[in-house]
């Protein structure tokens, strides 16, 4: 299911994680690759081959024009009725519903939805924070994998061979607090399988598979943040599995294997 692939081993001793400060305000058609490279270089943190570049989905969406003005939204009858019950903005709820494949759970004012990508999250990933203007919503990228591939290709055109992860902040069903996870990936396989390998005592792993993409997204969040205006993190010194056809699809559990769906 998860084939072993060749690895990119960066010639650095130890693992380094750093944020990229100084990025400009991202607007539609901003050249993200050029902006990231310029900001990193200006900060004395020039990108290098083998880096893993973790980019907050919000700036990807803004660069791709995935924003919507609330004034342009006409709420449906359901959105109006639901919003009146829970004191919510009906235009926001309408956008949440449009971005959803289905409502997974509804409890009080909380909507947990499955997006058209297959992600299960609050409010379809729709967000007002750091949108760039009052009354504007930022949506998830239409195809985060395609976004990651474009950014990886654009970085390669600038002479940098890096893997790219598009991240977003999600809640977790059984734990308090949010964490960043990967919603798009390019250049590296998202999962490291230990199936068929053996532990130090000779026991064979039958099901062990680690979601590296989520772990790396979470690690990069330690140096990123909305308040600090650092939407890009770089991980250096990690040996990653090269896969130019990688997508986030292997991370999404099929309904037939999901005990809680």
Predicted regions and their residues:
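Short, conserved active-site loops that position catalytic residues or coordinate cofactors/metal ions
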Residues: 50-51, 55-58, 63
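Phosphate-interacting basic helix/loop segments used at nucleotide- and nucleic-acid interfaces
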Residues: 30-45, 142-162
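N-terminal glycine-/serine-/threonine-rich phosphate-binding loop
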Residues: 10-52
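A structural signal for small-residue-enriched, beta-sheet-centric alpha/beta enzyme cores
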Residues: 13-24, 57, 67-73, 78-139, ...
């Amino acid at each position: 299911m998860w084939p072993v692939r060749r690895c990119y081993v960066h010639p650095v001793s130890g693992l380094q994680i750093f944020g990229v400060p100084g990025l400009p305000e991202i607007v539609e058609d901003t050249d993200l690759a050029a902006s990231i490279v310029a900001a990193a270089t200006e900060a004395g943190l020039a990108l290098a081959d083998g880096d893993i570049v973790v980019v907050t989905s919000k700036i990807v969406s803004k660069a791709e024009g995935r924003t919507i003005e609330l004034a342009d939204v006409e709420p449906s009858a359901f959105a109006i009725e639901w919003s009146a019950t829970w004191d919510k903005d009906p235009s926001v709820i309408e956008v949440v519903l449009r971005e959803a494949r289905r409502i997974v759970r509804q409890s009080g004012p909380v909507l947990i939805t499955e997006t058209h990508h297959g992600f299960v999250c609050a409010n379809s990933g729709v967000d007002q924070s750091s949108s760039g203007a009052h009354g504007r919503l930022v949506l998830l990228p239409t195809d985060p994998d395609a976004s990651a591939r474009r950014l990886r290709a654009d970085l390669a055109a600038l002479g940098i061979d890096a893997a790219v992860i598009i991240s977003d902040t999600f809640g977790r069903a059984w734990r308090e607090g949010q964490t960043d996870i990967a919603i798009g990936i390019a250049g590296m396989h998202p999962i490291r399988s230990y199936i068929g390998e053996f532990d130090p005592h000779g026991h064979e792993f039958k099901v062990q598979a680690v979601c590296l993409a989520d772990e790396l997204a979470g690690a990069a969040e330690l140096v990123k943040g909305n308040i600090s205006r650092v939407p890009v993190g770089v991980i250096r010194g990690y040996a990653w599995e090269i896969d130019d056809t990688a997508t986030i699809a292997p991370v999404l559990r099929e309904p037939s294997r999901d005990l809680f769906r």
